[in-house]
Amino acid sequence: MRLRTGWAMGFVMLPVLAVGASAQISLSSAVDLALRNDPRVKMSEAAVQKAHAALSETRDVYVPNLTANGGYGQGFGVPTGLPTVFSLSSQSLVFNYSQRDNIRAAASGLAAANLALSEMREQVEEDVVVAYLNLDSDERCDATMTQEYSDATRLVAIVQDRLNAGQDTRMNLLRAQRTAKQIELDQLNLQDEIATLSDHLSRLMGLSADRLTAIENSIPELPSVHAAAENGSQSYSPGVRSAVASARSKQQLSFGLNRYRLRPQMSLGINYSRIDTGQNGYATYYPSFAGKSQNAVSVYLEMELPIYDRLHQHQADEAAAEASRAHFETEQQRNQFLDGRFKLKRSAAELDKRSDLAQIDQDIAQEQVKVVSAQLTAGNGSSGGEQMTPVDEQNAKLTESARTIDLLHAQFQLSQAKVNLLRQTGQLDDWLKAAMRISEGIPASNVSH
């Protein structure tokens, strides 16, 4: 039985089709699931909600509150206060020099949280893309190794036959057997890595630890190294800009604390109280109160002028030092980002050349297989030249497989560097949109098992 589950986020997502303990999934679907299920994104979203609530809190001090309280009991002796049955009171801030800075600080904090969320989303996207590309590369390497192992076992059989006919040596047989065993061991290690990558992707996407496989044609072509490094419009990553906004928030908070002393603060208050003297001797001690209204209403404007406050002064000094530290920390983070991007550009250019070199080596190995096969088909030509044997043909095929695996590894390393550059230059989202368009055009039959 085939189980189909589809996810959508404003568009039709390519479904994940599962059979037993394995499933194929497109790149765009993997990224979408990770963005909605990864705990790091959830934590960043919660931080944004907290920052939004903090901003609302700084503004709500101007909104009048409403409080009700009451109580009733028997009193004896001299009354110590008004016999209030219940009261309603409301109070709000009217003016405070520091509050404007507090609002600006909270707004900058919200901006920092949103940028941190963008940074975390990009990090999750990068993690998923790199893991997906690695999985796709390893799966192709596994297919190549399967053919390579078949060629190696064929070589062992040929050398064994030649040894039995007295045309080869036991040393060559042992070497052929060792080659086959080494390929078998390498393939087992590769399959372990594939299982690890599949489990890692499943965890990123919030799925069960099913065996995931990549869909090669769901991966759009990556741009050139030059385009990935130079075409972006983003000078700094969202993480760096988040640090800048956070430092600005701390600076505004420092301003607010420094504007506390010798500056007036005004608040508005309203109070209504219901008085009852029936259960105590209040009228006895204050006879003029008898027969008067038992309703009390007061409206007041309160002003406070802090003159001397060592606690707030030290808090202001602490905030100023923290703002200064955040500023220099931001400068350091900015420099580290620029240094890392410069090194990545140089590294990507080198990996590009290495990939070209691996492609040439693989082409040479392919041509060598053609030459040896042609000579064997033609009967080795003239008797004066070097005679080709089936052993030479199998060795040429093994060399071709090894060069193909080297090429796949070089191409993955280059692709990883390009993805890193796309993220740092702000182009990763555009590239993933291309992946989405590709996924929408893949027929369902292409993702079945």
Regions found by a protein language model. Give the residues of each.
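Hydrophobic alpha-helical hairpins/lids featuring a short glycine-rich hinge
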Residues: 116-118
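"Short basic amphipathic alpha-helical interaction patches in structured regions
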Residues: 82, 101-109, 148
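Terminal intrinsically disordered/low-complexity segments used for targeting and assembly
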Residues: 1-33, 69, 191-232, 282, ...
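Amphipathic alpha-helical coiled-coil segments
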Residues: 43-58, 120, 124-145, 154, ...
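Periplasmic alpha-helical coiled-coil/stalk elements that build and connect Gram-negative outer-membrane
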Residues: 1-2, 25, 121-238, 347, ...
